[in-house]
Structures are given as structure tokens and as C-alpha cells.
């Protein structure tokens, strides 16, 4: 089954400056602020059609408030461009002329 979930996220631009002389600074001084979560919670939905031996629950984050700060990899995807999976990845059965393919 595909299930549509609407949630809120943190996104946007933060004021930042690029430092000259990057070769002489530690890597920790080179990080820039990003729009990230100040406070968030998790909501859980039940996925229909799961087998009885499978827990039919999916939890997802909901942004309560945002801030400009360092990206925390404990709960955020901090890469430049995330993998785009805006489609249902479960294999679908296609029917052509009454026959399943």
C-alpha cells in the first residue's frame, strides 16, 4: 500500500559568511548554519494491509519550530542533496487485457 503523509519540515536560508584562509582553520570552524529543527515531535500512523506478524506502524517527525544552527546528524539529513523517493517503492502489479504481468 502507498500512504500519503503530510507533515511540516524546516527549510529555508540562513545568513552565513564564508571564511578566507580555510587551509589554516580546523574543520569544525568551517561548518555553516542551516535551517534545522529547534523542536520536533513524532507522530505515528497505522499502515493498512500489513500481515498480522508485522507491526503496522510508521513514525515520522513533525517540526514544531525551526532555527538557524549547526546540522545535527542525530536527527537530520545533513547532506547537500537528499535522495529523492517521492514515489511508492512497493512493486505494483500491472494488468494488460485481463492478464497480470
From Swiss-Prot:
A cellular component annotation (GO) from this entry: cytoplasm
List of glycosylated residues: 6
SMART domains reported in the protein's UniProt record: GHB
InterPro entries linked: Cystine-knot_cytokine (IPR029034), Glyco_hormone_CN (IPR006208), Gonadotropin_bsu (IPR001545), Gonadotropin_bsu_CS (IPR018245)
Example of a GO biological process term: G protein-coupled receptor signaling pathway
Keywords: Disulfide bond, Glycoprotein, Hormone, Secreted
Main location: secreted
Pfam families to which the protein is assigned, alphabetical: Cys_knot (PF00007)
Subcellular location: Secreted
Disulfide cross-links: 2-88, 10-66, 14-68, 71-78
Source species, domain of life: Eukaryota
GO molecular function: hormone activity
Keyword Disulfide bond in annotation: yes
SUPFAM superfamilies in UniProt: Cystine-knot cytokines
Cited function: Indispensable for the control of thyroid structure and metabolism.
Family named by the database record: Belongs to the glycoprotein hormones subunit beta family.
Oligomeric form and interacting partners: Heterodimer of a common alpha chain and a unique beta chain which confers biological specificity to thyrotropin, lutropin, follitropin and gonadotropin.
Name this protein carries in UniProt: Thyrotropin subunit beta
Organism: Phodopus sungorus
Amino acid at each position: 500500500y502507498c500512504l500519503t503523509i503530510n507533515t511540516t519540515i524546516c527549510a529555508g536560508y540562513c545568513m552565513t559568511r564564508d571564511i578566507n584562509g580555510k587551509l589554516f582553520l580546523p574543520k569544525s570552524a568551517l561548518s555553516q548554519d542551516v535551517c534545522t529543527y529547534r523542536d520536533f515531535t513524532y507522530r505515528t500512523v497505522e499502515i493498512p494491509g500489513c500481515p498480522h506478524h508485522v507491526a503496522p506502524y510508521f513514525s515520522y517527525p513533525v517540526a514544531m519550530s525551526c532555527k538557524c544552527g549547526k546540522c545535527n546528524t542525530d536527527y537530520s539529513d545533513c547532506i547537500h542533496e537528499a535522495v529523492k523517493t517521492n514515489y511508492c517503492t512497493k512493486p505494483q502489479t500491472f494488468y494488460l487485457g485481463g492478464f497480470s504481468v
